[in-house]
Design a protein with these regions (language model features):
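Catalytic cores of histone-lysine modification enzymes
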Residues: 2-99
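C-terminal SET catalytic tail plus cysteine-rich post-SET Zn-binding segment of SAM-dependent SET-domain
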Residues: 93-191
Length: 191
């Protein structure tokens, strides 16, 4: 019997940013495919925000920590099963992330990534829930301090990140179908 395993490219490990993170097992070139993105596997359902009242507390915590929000609802994991989270769900946020999305919604390298480096992406590349707000712990030089579901609407943010935004947000941005664009403000970080 001849058994062939898929080459290991990424793995979980302890993170300085958020407890657990995803790390490169090999080096990646700019725009190189890293892993299947959330758009392909997890956009099968949209759970409306009105449904959240019927969901138990443990699941609500998982939704808050793992799911991407939209103005209408959130995108749950495949088969609505938080016991089946893939490695990619553990990619931490950084305002200067080294990962983005390609036109198919897969994770790709935004720049050269060295073996052993933590993979991070700016959650504003995917998050569009206008009520989303997260204090940032990334520590990058360009840290915005607070990440919101409206950051993607900022013209400067879009200019810098459009090619790496989740395809759904990229299409909305290119068509100009959003209102209330406000500049992203840098917030002084507490030390």
């Amino acid at each position: 019997m001849n058994v062939t395993f898929t080459k290991v490219r990424i793995e979980l490990g302890p993170s300085q940013i958020g407890g657990i993170g995803v790390f490169a097992v090999i080096s990646f070139r700019e725009n190189e495919y890293l892993a299947a993105g959330i758009a392909k596997t997890d956009y099968k359902h949209l759970v409306r925000w009105t449904e959240i009242a019927r969901i138990d507390g443990d699941i609500k915590d998982k939704i808050r920590h793992f799911c991407i929000g939209t103005p209408s609802g959130f995108i749950p994991p495949d088969k609505l099963d938080f016991n089946r989270l893939t490695v990619e769900w553990y990619i931490n946020h950084s305002c200067d992330g080294n990962v983005g999305f390609n036109e198919d919604g897969d994770f790709v390298a935004r720049r050269k990534i060295e073996k052993g480096e933590e993979l991070t992406y700016d959650y504003a590349l995917a998050e569009s829930n206008p009520r989303f707000r997260m204090e940032c712990n990334c520590g990058s030089a360009g840290c915005r301090g607070v990440i919101t579901g409206n950051d993607w609407k900022d013209p400067e943010f879009r200019e810098k990140n459009l090619d790496y935004m989740l395809p759904r947000l990229r299409r909305v941005s290119e068509a100009g179908r959003f209102a209330g664009a406000k500049p992203v403000r840098a917030v002084a970080r507490r030390r």
